[in-house]
Amino acid sequence: MYGQNVRNVSYYPPYGYNGYKQSGERMWRMSHSLPSGMDTDFTSSYPGPSAMNPRGRGGYNDFSGGGSAMGSMCNMAPAQSTNSLNSGGDGGGGDTQAVNGTNLIVNYLPQDMTDRELYALFRTCGPINTCRIMKDYKTGYSFGYAFVDFASEIDAQNAIKTVNGITVRNKRLKVSYARPGGESIKDTNLYVTNLPRTITDDELEKIFGKYGNIVQKNILRDKLTGRPRGVAFVRFNKREEAQEAISALNNVIPEGASQPLTVRLAEEHGKMKAHHFMNQLGMGPPAAPIPAAGPGYNNMVHRGRQNKMRNHKVHPYHNPQKFI
């Protein structure tokens, strides 16, 4: 117990993130919507080269192991994806910006998944430069998506073919190329509620498709029954198209629905979720401190007490001079 040598454990940045800055603002500045890893599909952007800082395989421990439960994951046949976003090099939606052929974004991660598990899952597909699950640096709350940067484009392409669509702890993973950030793809993801509980992908496309090119759409479904929950995410190719859809459909009852839709940016929905989560943990914004009283206040109180004693008339029965 006492007297034993205790190893000094210092903080190590996550895999490949020597220059990682613990800043909440860094998260909110990213063009994808925060933090809705439970539902939202983040495919809009990834951290730039200065944030990724790849070090190569020399700086990593191999967590996969021969006996890992995920050791043969890349030999599994992926389920057929129902997502409209192609996982090819176009980055989805015909965006003119080039994509990084080695950097992937992984969506719909289990809430309790760790960096080690994610690394073991993708390491079987090839050497990895960087691998990180995006989390709130204060609470550790997982946003449900991650970036994985492979050493070669062939390994990244293999990871998309083999891991995309598989189920991990009741979560169906979505793996695709991460698109570089830019002003043209910010604020393009919409969060839609009050949809009919019988809505299909084609009906969702019919409602929103008239306002622009839909890059991706995802109807959230009940885990047990598989029926729609009345909630969906719709990502447009341009910000202007998303804003037009908000103006045209928010608080409007579409054909076949019984209540008006709520359409807003997914980023706003993510911030509301994060604020609610922080309040549940008792980590909301601190109350404003009570200002300390200055010396002038103390002097005023002291003078008031002196004047009160000076003008106070003592009752005759309580006057000690009467009994002398």
Curated annotation (Swiss-Prot):
Q: Where is the RRM domain?
A: 102-180, 188-268
Instruction: Provide the primary localization.
Output: nucleus
The UniProt entry's GO biological process terms, in alphabetical order, are: alternative mRNA splicing, via spliceosome; sex determination
Gene Ontology terms for molecular function: mRNA binding
Q: Which UniProt keywords apply?
A: Nucleus, Repeat, RNA-binding
Q: Which GO terms of the cellular component aspect does the record hold?
A: nucleus; ribonucleoprotein complex
What tissue expression does the UniProt record report for this protein?
A: Expressed in somatic cells of both sexes throughout development, but not in the pole cells which are the progenitors of the germline.
The cross-references to Pfam families, in alphabetical order and at most eight, read: RRM_1
Which cellular compartments is it found in?
Answer: Nucleus
Q: What does this protein do?
A: Unknown; apparently not involved in somatic sex determination.
Note the PANTHER family from the entry: OS02G0815200 PROTEIN, RRM DOMAIN-CONTAINING PROTEIN
Quote the protein name from its UniProt record. Sex-lethal homolog
Q: Which organism is it from?
A: Musca domestica (House fly)
Gene coding for it: SXL
